[in-house]
Every structure is written in C-alpha cells, then in structure tokens.
Amino acid sequence: MLFRISMSATEFLLASLIFCLVFWVIRASRPRVPKGLKNPPGPWGWPLIGHILTLGKNPHLALSRMSQRYGDVLQIRIGSTPVLVLSGLDTIRQALVQQGDDFKGRPNLYSFTLISNGQSMSFGPDSGPVWAARRRLAQNGLKSFSIASDPASSSSCYLEEHVSKEAEVLISKLQEQMAGPGHFNPYRYVVISVANVICAICFGQRYDHNHQELLSLVNLSNNFGEVVGSGNPADFIPILRYLPNRSLNGFKDLNEKFHSFMQKMIKEHYKTFEKGHIRDITDSLIEHCQEKQLDENANIQLSDEKIVNVVLDLFGAGFDTVTTAISWSLMYLVTNPRVQRKIQEELDTVIGRSRRPRLSDRSHLPYMEAFILETFRHSSFVPFTIPHSTTRDTSLKGFYIPKGRCVFVNQWQINHDQKLWVNPSEFLPERFITPDGAIDKVLSEKVILFGLGKRKCIGETIARWEVFLFLAILLQRVEFSVPPGVKVDMTPIYGLTMKHACCEHFQMQLRS
C-alpha cells in the first residue's frame, strides 16, 4: 500500500513538472507585449493540434460564435501556429483600411506555394513594390478590356458585349435541356458561360459548352476553394502534407492543368502578336513585357512567367466568384418565387421586352440590385478573405500583434451580425430599399464579400456588373422553377467560395 502511494505521488509530481514545463515554454514563446498593450484573448487549445477540432467543418460559424465570447479581436492556434481572427465591421475596416499597410501581407502557407509556383499576385507572400506594380498593371488591363468601350460594337463596353452574347447562348443551352431531359443543373452551364466572358477578356476568344479541356478545368475548380479556404489543417500541420489526401492531390493537379492551359494560350498569343494591335489583356501584358518596364516610376521588369501568373490571377478572380454568385442567385430565385416575380415586374416596367437590358439600366433597377445585395449578404459565399498577415509589429484595439502573424478576416460574421442586420437569417431584399424606393447606400456598404483595403479584389466592380447583367438578361426572358415538392438544399459547403449542393431539378420556361 505504501509503495502504491509512493508511486502515485511520484507520478503526480512528474505530471505537475511536465505541466509546468509546457506552461513555461508556451509563455516563453509568446512575444513580449509592449507596455500599455495586451495579448488578444482566446480559448485554450489542445496540444499539437490547437483549435482544429473546434473549427470543425464550418470555421466561419465556429469563429463567429467564438467572437461573441472573446470579442472582435481574438487569437486561436491551428497546430502550433497562432492565428489572429478579426470580426466586426468597424474592427475589420480599422485593420484593412486605416491600418492597411500593417495588414496587407499574405502568410506563406503551403497551399499558396502550389499556386503559380508560389508567385501568385493574389496568394503570394510579396506585398512590396513589385507586387504593387503588377497589381496596377492587372487593374489597368482589366479596365481596358472590360469597362472600356468597343468602337466596333453597339454595346456600351466590352463586358456588356461579352455577357450579352454568353447570356443568349446560355438561354439556348437551357432550352435544349428542357426539350430533352426536361430539367437541368444550372451550375453546369453557368460555369462555362462565365468562363467564356473572362476568356474573351483575357484571350479574345470563347469556347463551346462541350469543349473538353475547359470543362475539365472548371469541373476541378471546386477543389481549389476547398484547399485554400481559411483553416486548412495541411497549411499549419506539416505532417498532414505527406499523408494520403485526395483534396490536396486534386488541388496540385488543378494548378498544374491551369498553368499548362495559360502557358499554351500565351504561347499562341506570342505567335500572333502585333505591336499597335492589342486584342486583349494577354496582348497588353506581352507589350509591357517587351518594353521591359511596368511603369515610368517602378522600373520593374515583367518576365514571361509573370505574364502567366498575372493572367492566372485574373482568370481565377473573374471566374469562380461570378459563377458562384449567379448560381446562388438562381437558388434563391426558385426558393423565393415572390422575389423572382417582383424582379421581373421591375424589368418589364423599366425596360420592357423590346430591347435587351444594358449596364446603364442598373441604377434604374433598385429591386434587382437589392436582390443581388441580399444574395451576397445572406449566402456570404466568400466567408473569409484570403488570409492576411501583418507586415510589421502593430496594435489593434489595444491588442499587440507581432509581425508575420496570420490573420483570418471573418466576412460571414459581418454579414450576419445582429448589431448591423434585423433578422439576419431571413432572406429579405426589401431591407436594402428606402421608403422612397431607392437603394439604401449606407446599408449596402455594410455587405462585405470582396475584402477591403489594399488586398481588395481587383475585379469587384466588374464582378458586380457581370452578375447584374447576366441575371437581368436571363430574368427578362425566362422564369426559373423546380417541380412542386422538390426540396432545394441551400446548405453551404465550406471553402474559399462556398458552393451549394448540386441541384439537378431546375426547370425553365420562356416568359409569355
């Protein structure tokens, strides 16, 4: 009996010693906090894995709940890596806009190194002058071949011309499906239509809806968001990269295929390039490459490989977000037929049936705009921005944040914050309409989907225009529905962009 007590005491002392040692190591590894500041609060995590189990399959929901307890600035660990989590509109604006230079970095995550060989403008760790110059170049190219007018076209700009053409083709494809099987999965056709718009802008060409190479790429695109979504364990626990992982393998395959596709397109452009006859974004980048200078001030060279990376970023930015937005919009239309009828009544009143909707109609269609805003808010299909990191030691709301800290920005929390929204779980486009029938500008600016500040999505304006025009043309011509009794699954599937479950039961009829 004495021996057992002695052993128990020894074990207790040993366990206490180990606990104290671990506690001391954790405390010692924390950065020294300057006087007057404090460490961000947060729950204790498990050894080695941190808060992975707490995040679960829906990190945006778990971290939103956590923010209710710990506040808008909190800290978790994924593996052994500390991660700052920001919530609340005012806090996020403070960090990304007012303190934009402090929070404009990108963490050097493993999945990010697989995109464009680690040289992606959107995902790469660079945030210095080279990155800024490449971003300006991409913005200018995007503007020149989307918002700018085409002298040879009756459309107001290139984007309107491309979207109008693809929307008409899309309606024809859906009519074929109704004449055949009698139902369809809209995502299968929307994804090619949207891809064709960005292909026209980047490469000056479109593809048939049955083009196998393009189909292969877009069908793999869901895997991209699954891997690079905030909180992927393989980014924070290195050993997981070497275990069997179907998603990660698919992600590598997708990036290789996209890179190969872009290289082929750019090689073809080089063969037919004519100085002074710039056809698309790729041509404009080749021209800059040959001049060996990005702009007059930076004197930064743009290599052939950088052209591939810039085009890849533009293609990704202009494809997945718009496809997901339109797809979610169609889901909300069939589950809210009252809203669909109200949009169509507005279209009939403002535009009629004698001409096609144009981008210039957008300001005269407030209910359509309110529907799009509510789709963005309610679905919050981009739950987090691409993770940020701090570029230097800084502070936020009285908390000390060291240089190099990985930062998650919870956009979903903003869009469902009960402090900002009445009944946030309810889908109600009318919340954005003022008593005099206009869009509530102040409220609309509280919907955050494209990020803020220096890392804000460069294609935001074009994406909003494209979503509007696709939906306006479709809803002027057709009505969407599902058969009576069919339940539509609106549960989001977590990723960088959250998709909904596949719905094969869509039906469409031309409006009388």
From Swiss-Prot:
Catalytic activity: an organic molecule + reduced [NADPH--hemoprotein reductase] + O2 = an alcohol + oxidized [NADPH--hemoprotein reductase] + H2O + H(+); estrone + reduced [NADPH--hemoprotein reductase] + O2 = 2-hydroxyestrone + oxidized [NADPH--hemoprotein reductase] + H2O + H(+); estrone + reduced [NADPH--hemoprotein reductase] + O2 = 4-hydroxyestrone + oxidized [NADPH--hemoprotein reductase] + H2O + H(+); estrone + reduced [NADPH--hemoprotein reductase] + O2 = 6alpha-hydroxyestrone + oxidized [NADPH--hemoprotein reductase] + H2O + H(+)
Protein's UniProt keywords contain Ribonucleoprotein: no
Quaternary data: Interacts with cytosolic chaperones HSP70 and HSP90; this interaction is required for initial targeting to mitochondria. Interacts (via mitochondrial targeting signal) with TOMM40 (via N-terminus); this interaction is required for translocation across the mitochondrial outer membrane.
Keywords assigned: Cytoplasm, Endoplasmic reticulum, Glycoprotein, Heme, Iron, Lipid biosynthesis, Lipid metabolism, Lyase, Membrane, Metal-binding, Microsome, Mitochondrion, Mitochondrion inner membrane, Monooxygenase, Oxidoreductase, Steroid biosynthesis
BP terms from Gene Ontology: estrogen metabolic process; fatty acid metabolic process; retinol metabolic process; steroid biosynthetic process
Record: glycosylation sites: S67
Gene (UniProt): CYP1A1
E.C. number: 1.14.14.1, 4.2.1.152
Source organism of the structure: Macaca mulatta (Rhesus macaque)
Amino-acid positions noted as binding substrate in the UniProt annotation, renumbered to this chain: F224
Cofactor: heme
Superkingdom per UniProt: Eukaryota
GO molecular function, one term: heme binding
Residues that, per the record, bind heme: C457
Record family assignment: Belongs to the cytochrome P450 family.
Function: A cytochrome P450 monooxygenase involved in the metabolism of various endogenous substrates, including fatty acids, steroid hormones and vitamins. Mechanistically, uses molecular oxygen inserting one oxygen atom into a substrate, and reducing the second into a water molecule, with two electrons provided by NADPH via cytochrome P450 reductase (CPR; NADPH-ferrihemoprotein reductase). Catalyzes the hydroxylation of carbon-hydrogen bonds.
A GO CC annotation given for this chain: endoplasmic reticulum membrane
Pfam family, one: p450
Protein name per UniProt: Cytochrome P450 1A1
